[in-house]
């Protein structure tokens, strides 16, 4: 019977521990619910009982759009100055020649023409064979 008493005692201890854990969880839930019910005054100052005017905190120095645009403007000015400092004599006019106005059309047509090229060659061969056979028939008749 002593073993049954030990098992019962250990069970009582485990249940007591579970009750304590559950009570702690309930307390934390209650405190969280209280925190949720706190009213945030974003535009209203309860001490003055009037709307907030101006900035409460000083502006921070996070990168703004204006700062970024100034940086981009300075970079482009530097690039333009670097490009203008390159002497004209160094540029080779032969390498700067423009492409044909239809270069992109030719590029697109090359793929289509590949498949048509074999058909074209077959048709030419057929007409040549037909011409040869007609000449052979005409020489036989004559």
Curated annotation (Swiss-Prot):
The lineage of its organism: Eukaryota, Fungi, Dikarya, Ascomycota, Taphrinomycotina. GO terms for biological process: mRNA cis splicing, via spliceosome. It holds the Pfam family cwf18. Its main location: nucleus. Belongs to the 40S cdc5-associated complex (or cwf complex), a spliceosome sub-complex reminiscent of a late-stage spliceosome composed of the U2, U5 and U6 snRNAs and at least brr2, cdc5, cwf2/prp3, cwf3/syf1, cwf4/syf3, cwf5/ecm2, spp42/cwf6, cwf7/spf27, cwf8, cwf9, cwf10, cwf11, cwf12, prp45/cwf13, cwf14, cwf15, cwf16, cwf17, cwf18, cwf19, cwf20, cwf21, cwf22, cwf23, cwf24, cwf25, cwf26, cyp7/cwf27, cwf28, cwf29/ist3, lea1, msl1, prp5/cwf1, prp10, prp12/sap130, prp17, prp22, sap61, sap62, sap114, sap145, slu7, smb1, smd1, smd3, smf1, smg1 and syf2. The gene is cwf18. This is Pre-mRNA-splicing factor cwf18. Residues 24-45 have a biased composition (Basic and acidic residues). Residues 24-54 are annotated as: Disordered. It is found in: Nucleus. Keywords: mRNA processing, mRNA splicing, Nucleus. Involved in mRNA splicing where it associates with cdc5 and the other cwf proteins as part of the spliceosome. GO terms for cellular component: cytosol; nucleus; post-mRNA release spliceosomal complex; Prp19 complex; spliceosomal complex; U2-type spliceosomal complex.
